[in-house]
Amino acid sequence: MKTVTIEDLKQFVFIENPVYAPDGKSLAFIKATVDEKNNGYHRDLYLVKDGMVRQYTAKENTSFVLWNDETEMIISRKAETPGTTELLKLSVDGGEAIPWMALPFPLVKLHKLDNGNYVVIGSVKADEPDAWKVKAQKKEEDQSSCTVVDELPYWMTGSGYINKDRNCLFVIRDGTVDRITGADWNVDETVVDGNRMYYTCSKKDPSICLYQKLYCYDGNTGEISCIYDAWTHSIQNLYIVNGTLYFQASDMREYGVNETGKICTIKNGTIVTVCKPDRSMYNSVASDIALGGGKQRAVMDGALYSLETDEDHTMIVRYDEDGKKTIIKDAEETLFCMDAADHRIAYVSSSPSSLQELFELDVNTGEVTKLTDFNGAYVQDTTISIPERVDYESEGKSLHGWVIKPVGYEKGKKYPCVLDVHGGPRTVYGSSFFHEMQVWAAEGYFVCFTNIKGSDGRGDAFADIRGDYGGEDYRDLMIFMDRVLETYPDIDENRLCETGGSYGGFMTNWIITHTDRFCCAASQRSIASWISFSLIADIGPEFGTDQCGAKKSWDDATFDKLWHHSPLKYIRNAHTPTLFIHSDQDYRCPLSEGMQMMQGLAVQGVETRLCIFHGENHELSRSGKPANRIRRLREITDWFEQHTKA
């Protein structure tokens, strides 16, 4: 059998966005594969019907948009003109897709009302809200070489400059498109109930607003009414059960911007709490084998079915109208997305020994049916090293992590080891297949990873490390590393490597400025200074001060607190050879963060290297261009090789 290699990325199949037809008898989804020739990804539409999986498009980069009815789908494909959207109709009986609508703006979301009209969320410019009516060629001619920004956020990772960008509601009646909301506010979340659409709006000021108001659009009368008119809550995840609107709402007073929203409803203009979930109602398990997304929740049989992250894996749970929670599925898996209809739940899953596949769960019987086997041949022909659980105690907490042994491990032989730190910090590692870790195991490394204080999966209190970045979280990691060395004596403690991205990149920078126990490190999309991060990153002004426990007064105390938690403050203590990986379009953890750390090491004579990936953003390791993903992993692996096997 072969071992896992960096180039194996080209063989992986990714599954996205499973959606049932209105009658629940057909299931559409997207299959994505690497397009090596064009350094991108092919996305094609597939359908599961009568137990058969059938391909409906071929190499067209199709995105599934909406079931028009049980016999017809509306899909989109890449339009020839930038900034526009081409929509087509495709019958479940097959045949060519028929052009339906050409929208002169980027499509964000499409809904169908019971009266046959459609409501579209589209992106426009606030200072030119009707510029979409002008031909694209004319708009391109008007583009200036100067970008002006006068609001926050003015850029967003994955989107670029977004100054004055607004998501507005449009209605499609008899083939005519009309804008129905103003461009001063931004439409965020939506849900349809018959001929009504509920949606949230956030205001755009020179500063960032984290709160939303709640509105209702009546598709019959065209009237818009505000049903919650106070800037007091972050309102997300709208859904309808038996004609009643529910949503998650948080005032962020107890646990800050990462606080889990309560399930609520509206009564007489007041937010009423139904229940407080004890876990995040989405999948937050880190992965590098998932390309796109899909639904995290769906309504069926008068209840909400949702993904939830529990410690180190994803569950499916049910919330009744009164807030009662029932666990529907709980196994050692990562569930990426789901949909529900007709007593069945379709979901995309991976496990310690498998990549993504599509499954269907019968809620009545508990029977699980595997619908696809796209990655089966790869798994069957490849040696995969299964993670072994390691339990440990740290400052009164019972924690656990995992160790992956080197492929071909021989007891008594000494091996190097890689400590891998997840991002977030409010995400988790699980035991499911992780490409980069399997590559390092195949290259002869032990690989260890864990969920420290600040991770998701255990509720808000455990996830809360505001004002203590580099404190208890760092100590947990070092105690875990001690436990791993104690449990696996064949690890050479003189050949320990460390890496991590985003929060894991922050932690890498913190580690190299606080200990010399690692022979080398690879810091990815990292944070060097909470001051520069807070004043440059897309989410910086709110996230930086919140996470560091600093006031937004921007006085000396604010800067002192931000600087206290900044790895750059301690750069004089760093001696570890460190590689930095950054993308020049990453506005979440900007390139300037890696540059500061790299230069700080270089001027002190510490061995360092910075790799800048052009045209990539914060998602390089997960959905970047295939060639760049391969180059990134090769750079890190070569850096480890250089410092452990020379």
Regions found by a protein language model. Name each.
Residues 43, 124-170, 213, 261-264, ...:
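Predominantly five- to eight-bladed beta-propeller fold
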Residues 4-10, 53-56, 96-101, 177-181, ...:
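A short beta-strand motif characteristic of beta-propeller blades
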Residues 374-494, 501:
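Cap/lid segment of the alpha/beta-hydrolase catalytic domain
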Residues 37-42, 80-85, 160-166, 206-212, ...:
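Short, solvent-exposed loop/turn segments at conserved positions within beta-propeller repeat blades
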Residues 452-646:
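Active-site-proximal cap/loop segments of hydrolase catalytic domains
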Residues 49-51, 91-95, 173-176, 218-222, ...:
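Short loop/turn segments that connect beta-strands within beta-propeller blades
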Residues 12-27, 59-76, 102-118, 156-160, ...:
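Conserved beta-propeller blade repeats
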Residues 44-46, 86-88, 168-170, 213-215, ...:
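A short loop-to-beta-strand structural motif that recurs across blades of beta-propeller domains
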